[in-house]
Amino acid sequence: GKDETRHFGEQAKKYEEEKILAIRKAEDPYVRWARNVVESYVMNKTVPALPSKLPESMLKNRAGVFVSIKKDGQLRGCIGTFQPTTDNIALEIRNNAISASTRDPRFSPIINIELPKLIYSVDILGEVTPATYEELDPQKYGVIVKHHEKRGLLLPRLDGVDTVSEQIEIAARKAGIYDDEDIELFKFEVVRHY
């Protein structure tokens, strides 16, 4: 009856909360920093200062960074830079975490009530190099499709993107590049942090 359904619903909710708690405990410093930035920005509209205990790799190195946010297994925001725009990876994460949570044009800005349900990943991009169709592999490489000033990027290892043609087609569509236009292809590897 109704009580059983409610009981099942409560169990499912508890299971989800425990799952997210386990993910939070296992977060590496890159992801924890991205989450802390989003929570601070969404709750208080403040941009947090860099914490003193970040790994040296985040403070000394520069790279393009993508911050992806999911809710209930679905993308909720994803913004990034394919080349560094700041002095270090920590600042790059901070800027892109704020943008992913509040400025992704595909989604409304994230609100307080969603914060406990969000799961984050941070991609640190390697060197971007010219590529041929044959060199691409959607499991290993991200792709940038370029036509004059238009440019579309797709990260590697995305659910539902299994072939090079799918990867190129989606990246081209994101950039507003049409099938009959000449394109240049570029590839890059990422280190994905959870």
Residue map of PLM features:
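Basic nucleic-acid-binding interfaces
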Residues: 3-194
